[in-house]
Amino acid sequence: MNEDDIDVNTPSPARIYDYWLGGSHNFAVDREVGKRAAEAMPTLRAAIWANRAFLRRVVTHLATELGVDQFLDLGSGVPTVGNVHEVAQAANPAARVVYVDIDPIAVAHGRRLLADDDRATVIQADLRRPADVLSRPELGEVLDLGRPVAVLMIAVLHFLPDADHPGDIVRAYRDRIAPGSYLALSHAADDTDLPAEQARMIEEYQKSTKVPFIHRDPDELAGWLDGLELVPPGIVLTNQWHPDEEASRILRTHGVVARKP
């Protein structure tokens, strides 16, 4: 990683998220934004951990119930507790995982974490360029795209404005993965009935960063998944997706897993 690649003056979603989770891989500018957002929404950290719980449930279900042993985690962020490879390999020691993030700090720490694991790696790439991501030699060294793979887009697509055409991005990954593969995503729910404190948090976040935060409704998400079979219970609030504990209702996000026939 080249130090010139690291912008310490611009907040990064990956590093802000790391700060909220209590991590140390962040800078003063990230902590300042994260602190103001958390002050606007005191329950924010609990909601962030609830999102991690959703990711864990998805990976566990895919590995144990649906037989998936390959995972591609897009916008994976800074490594923290409950990483995909830890959850997947606990269910199936042969599971293989590739992480993708654009943030050089996230990638550097991911590579350090995975240095001794030949079944997992991290790639610095832009998830908005599916053809580039899927053609990377490093990815091909870990994943066999001729076999089913689970593509994870957890809490990342709401950072993409409509100008980035997130639906087209999702469909591009769909078209390039093998039959029997899965797409899993979570996304901030539409803001028509948003809790007041979450609305304040998002307003504070958007004032402080250059990164958008877009709410979208379930019908739009469903359109992104055309041609796929939704795994029951379909598109629901994440706390309702195969809950195995008291799931948080604080942060309104929808989640879904879909299979490519």
Regions found by a protein language model. Name each.
Residues 234-236, 240-261:
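Core SAM-dependent methyltransferase catalytic element
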Residues 197-217:
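Conserved Class I S-adenosyl-L-methionine
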Residues 211-235:
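Short alpha-helix
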Residues 130-134, 159-172:
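A short, conserved alpha-helix within the catalytic core of class I
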Residues 149-153, 169-170, 176-188:
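Conserved beta-strand signature within the Rossmann-like core of class I S-adenosyl-L-methionine
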